[in-house]
């Protein structure tokens, strides 16, 4: 499994220290254990988790900007946890409305000493942190427009949304911000289509 992750990271053109890669794999084993009782993810094998969770999450790393990142609907921690592992200099806030998921994330952050993450259990529309984020990430949670509307109050002017999608979201992009750019993501070992919708916040 170590070699599979290393090869995948190399294919993505990223540099992640081996110690960090080992922590990522340990996190997956921890998730697998919790998943038996709490059903946090439908993907249960470590090999598949590496592809569908770790490498999929890390594929958006080149597009990450700023120091304050909000991961919306973080669930079992994707893409927030892998990104936090890879970018210890950035501050990540992971928000989810479900108690069992935030409980897992709190335990994981403590166990693996992920000191650059803050875990919040709340609906994102009600979240008022008192500051703005530079980037908002989201995977598998609602349409592009819905995500933008629910989180607009949290993103600074000039900041960006990075919304992860499967197939090209043509219908979702109709009527949304004209500054949307869609990147094709090539995730090593993943045959399914993956796209990243990047939208800049042009509010004054």
UniProtKB/Swiss-Prot annotation:
It comes from the Bacteria. GO terms for cellular component: cytosol. GO terms for molecular function: rRNA (guanine-N7-)-methyltransferase activity. Coiled coil: none annotated. Transmembrane segments: none annotated. Its EC number is 2.1.1.170. The keyword S-adenosyl-L-methionine applies. It is found in: Cytoplasm. Keywords: Cytoplasm, Methyltransferase, rRNA processing, S-adenosyl-L-methionine, Transferase. Its main location: cytoplasm. The keyword Cytoplasm applies. It catalyses: guanosine(527) in 16S rRNA + S-adenosyl-L-methionine = N(7)-methylguanosine(527) in 16S rRNA + S-adenosyl-L-homocysteine. Pfam families: GidB (PF02527). S-adenosyl-L-methionine binds at residues 73, 78, 139. Belongs to the methyltransferase superfamily. RNA methyltransferase RsmG family. Specifically methylates the N7 position of guanine in position 527 of 16S rRNA. NCBIfam families: rsmG_gidB. This is Ribosomal RNA small subunit methyltransferase G. The lineage of its organism: Bacteria, Pseudomonadati, Pseudomonadota, Gammaproteobacteria, Legionellales. The gene is rsmG.
């Amino acid at each position: 499994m170590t070699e599979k992750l290393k090869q995948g990271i190399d294919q993505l053109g990223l540099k992640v220290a081996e110690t960090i890669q080992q922590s990522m794999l340990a996190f997956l084993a921890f998730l697998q254990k919790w998943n038996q009782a709490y059903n946090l993810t439908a993907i249960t094998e470590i090999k598949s988790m590496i592809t569908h969770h770790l490498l999929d999450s890390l594929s958006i790393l080149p597009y990450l900007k700023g120091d304050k990142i909000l991961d919306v609907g973080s669930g079992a921690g994707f893409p927030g946890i892998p990104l936090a592992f890879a970018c210890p200099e950035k501050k990540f806030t992971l928000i989810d409305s479900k108690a069992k998921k935030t409980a897992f994330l709190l335990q994981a952050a403590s166990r693996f000493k992920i000191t650059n993450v803050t875990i919040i259990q709340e609906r994102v529309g009600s979240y008022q942190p008192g500051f703005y984020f530079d980037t908002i990430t989201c995977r598998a949670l609602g349409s592009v427009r819905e995500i933008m509307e629910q989180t607009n109050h949290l993103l600074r002017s000039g900041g960006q949304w990075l919304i992860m999608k499967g197939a090209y979201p043509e219908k979702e992009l109709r009527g949304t911000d004209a500054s949307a750019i869609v990147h094709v993501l090539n995730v090593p070992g993943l045959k399914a289509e993956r796209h990243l919708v990047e939208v800049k916040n042009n509010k004054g």
